Amino acid sequence: MSSTGCRVLPRAVILMAVIGGASMPLAPCFGQEAAPRPEVFNQCAVCHSTDGSNGTGPTLKGLFGRPAGTVLGFRYSRAMRGAGIVWDAKALDDYLRSPQDFIPGNVMPFSGVADSAERAGLIAYLRSLK
């Protein structure tokens, strides 16, 4: 190979890497990739957003680590405001299994997710919504 070929080949490899990398999504590089959205979330999406805006229900964006009943601009039930819990995997699992049993008097019109695998997938998705 000629000396010109030796200089061009590394440049071509770098160029291909740059072009190929430019077509890749940037979210994983910044830790923003959401977990796969489970089908059971379709029930949640009727009332809840994942983009930071409130609907019939409060946004679920940033749910993990947030005290229950504290999203600005959303009017919570007295039960939810006074629940005294911080949303983590255990609290969400208990709540999603049976919302009324976990926080009696909350007004979310949802009976729960009985299947533990569906709850686990839903919780993983909710955890990824930062």
Regions found by a protein language model. Give the residues of each.
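N-terminal secretory signal peptides that target proteins for export/translocation
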Residues: 1-9
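Sec-dependent signal peptide hydrophobic core
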Residues: 9-17
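C-terminal segment of classical bacterial N-terminal signal peptides
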Residues: 19-29
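Sequence/structural segment immediately N-terminal to covalent heme-attachment motifs in c-type
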Residues: 32-55, 60
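Structured segments of extracytoplasmic/periplasmic soluble domains
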Residues: 43, 47-50, 63-66, 83, ...
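Solvent-exposed helix-loop boundary motif
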Residues: 57-58, 62-78, 97
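Short Fe-S-cluster ligation motifs
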Residues: 72-93
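C-terminal capping alpha-helices of c-type cytochrome domains
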Residues: 88-130
